């Protein structure tokens, strides 16, 4: 079922995109507030990272389950329930009086976000017809998703400096509750037509536990060591759980994840590229923030403002990407985006300890923003092309999970690369910490560029050129059909 009024569709898209913006923003907004949070709640240095990790861990672990629940029990229903949970968790987090309290609230936020995000994307898919109309909608979606991380750093700096760290959490409450209240008016309920209340509990337990443990192992590997007993045991248990999930799903009468969806070649390729996008880009924001604050000496607010050109460029490039997908197809657009990301990260690798924002950061920020817009929009379209409406939540959960796991894996690898290079420079006799840190960042950016280059190759090899061409032709026909009545008038 879909909304037929153009105005209703536009309002629905605004609601869904704004909600996704908040979800993405929340993964980054606390970063610049961490020093203030640490002082206020007496966090240890190791525990402070869990303000971020608790959200990332639960979000990444539950995305696939959240998407499938939306298909089975109603996309609007799960969207609203996730928003209420997310908002209440944000309120509790802002009221936190201890480190344990805040970490628990952040985990609950992650759970709410894991329900909201795939439900919102699947509602976009069921509201907008495949083709030019959906491409435009996903252009808006890509713009807000891509700019959310940069906006989170900016907004986090402003709120922390002028209102206090609590407001990086309180800001979600009115937005989330307002969105939940508007949902019944603007969104039409939809779910799998033959869905029953029978639920694959074993599949849900194994895939959620496996993904959560995998993300946990990755985000904590840099602290405890890749070869440590803790990391090896966590990865082994995650592998056992995910392997068990595959066995369970092949035998279940009503599997949580019907593996028939993986027969779609383009979907498989898009998820592989989505993993590489996460590996290349999520850590980029982390290292740029460190460079701005620890090498260039920027305040949290100034570092946040430095992201403004990047965020604005993403919005423009995502809109351009949706039009380009309609004209030439999602495959060439995605390849171009991945190449631009690789070029930008190689450019970032030229930063110096005596650098400046204009000379070292602004140029590659604009290039990576164009690449990000050109990558996010087509990879989302490719990951959902040809997917039956009743499995749209599952497809949404898959691409979101690929990007989140990729982000955790990329950050774990690149943080290890950066710290290893920094330690080597210091041990060689370099006494200037800014020089040692910068050389570590340079190495991380180069490896990230390699991830993006591999993503471009995978897009060229794994994504169907025929699907891309057919999607573009169908979108063009849809545009022509939409223009015909207005020309006749």
Predicted regions: what is each one?
Residues 1-185, 319-321, 328, 332-334, ...:
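Transmembrane-helix bundle of Major Facilitator Superfamily
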Residues 21, 57, 91-92, 107, ...:
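Hydrophobic residues within the alpha-helical transmembrane core of Major Facilitator Superfamily
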Residues 74-83, 97-101, 116-120, 129-140, ...:
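C-terminal module of multi-pass small-molecule transporters
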Residues 23, 52-55, 59, 86, ...:
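Structural signature of transmembrane alpha-helices in multi-pass secondary transporters
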Residues 35, 67-68, 156-157, 215, ...:
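Small-residue-mediated transmembrane helix hinge/kink sites in multi-pass secondary transporters
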Residues 121, 173-192, 208-220, 237-252, ...:
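C-terminal membrane-cytosol helix-exit motif in multi-pass small-molecule transporters
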Residues 1-8, 193-196, 462-489:
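Intrinsic disorder in cytosolic terminal tails and internal cytosolic loops
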């Amino acid at each position: 079922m879909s909304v037929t009024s153009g105005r209703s569709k536009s309002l629905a898209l605004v609601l869904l995109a704004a909600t996704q913006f908040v979800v993405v923003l929340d993964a980054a907004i606390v970063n610049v507030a961490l020093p203030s949070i640490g002082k206020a709640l007496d966090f240890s240095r190791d525990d402070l990272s869990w303000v971020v990790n608790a959200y990332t861990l639960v979000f990444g672990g539950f995305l696939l389950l959240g998407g499938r629940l939306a298909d089975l029990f109603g996309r609007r229903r799960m969207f609203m329930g996730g928003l209420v949970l997310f908002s209440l968790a944000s309120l509790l987090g802002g009221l936190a009086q201890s480190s344990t309290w805040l970490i628990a609230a952040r985990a609950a936020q992650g759970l709410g976000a894991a329900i909201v995000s795939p439900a919102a994307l699947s509602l976009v898919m069921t509201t907008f017809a495949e083709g030019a109309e959906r491409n435009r909608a996903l252009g808006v979606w890509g713009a807000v998703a891509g700019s959310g991380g940069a906006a989170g750093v900016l907004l986090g700096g402003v709120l922390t400096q002028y209102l206090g760290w609590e407001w990086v959490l309180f800001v979600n409450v009115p937005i989330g509750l307002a969105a939940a209240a508007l949902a019944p008016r603007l969104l039409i309920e939809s779910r799998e037509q033959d869905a029953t209340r029978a639920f694959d509990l074993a599949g849900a337990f194994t895939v959620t536990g496996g993904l959560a443990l995998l993300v946990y192992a990755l985000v904590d590997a840099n602290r405890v060591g890749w070869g440590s007993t803790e990391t090896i045991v966590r990865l082994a248990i995650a592998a056992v759980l995910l392997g068990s999930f595959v066995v369970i799903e092949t035998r279940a009468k009503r599997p949580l994840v019907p593996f028939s969806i993986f027969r779609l070649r383009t979907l498989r390729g898009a998820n592989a590229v989505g993993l590489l996008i996460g590996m290349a880009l999520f850590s980029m924001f982390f290292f740029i923030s460190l460079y701005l604050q620890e090498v260039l000496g920027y305040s949290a607010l100034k570092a946040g403002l430095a992201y403004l050109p990047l965020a604005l460029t993403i919005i423009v490039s995502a809109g351009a990407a949706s039009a380009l997908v309609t004209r030439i197809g999602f495959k060439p657009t995605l390849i171009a985006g991945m190449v631009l990301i690789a070029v930008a990260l190689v450019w970032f690798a030229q930063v110096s300890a005596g650098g400046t924002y204009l000379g070292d950061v602004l140029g590659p920020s604009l290039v990576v923003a164009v690449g990000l817009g050109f990558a996010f929009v087509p990879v989302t379209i490719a990951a959902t092309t040809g997917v039956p409406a009743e499995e749209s939540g599952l497809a949404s959960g898959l691409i979101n999970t690929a990007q989140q796991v990729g982000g955790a894996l990329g950050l774990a690898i690149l943080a290890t690369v950066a710290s290893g290079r920094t330690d080597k420079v210091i041990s060689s006799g370099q006494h200037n910490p800014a020089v040692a840190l910068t050389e570590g960042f340079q190495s991380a950016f180069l490896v990230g560029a390699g991830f993006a280059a591999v993503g471009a190759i995978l897009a060229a090899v794994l994504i169907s050129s025929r699907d891309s061409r057919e999607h573009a032709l169908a979108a063009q026909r849809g545009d022509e059909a939409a223009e015909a009545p207005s020309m006749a008038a």
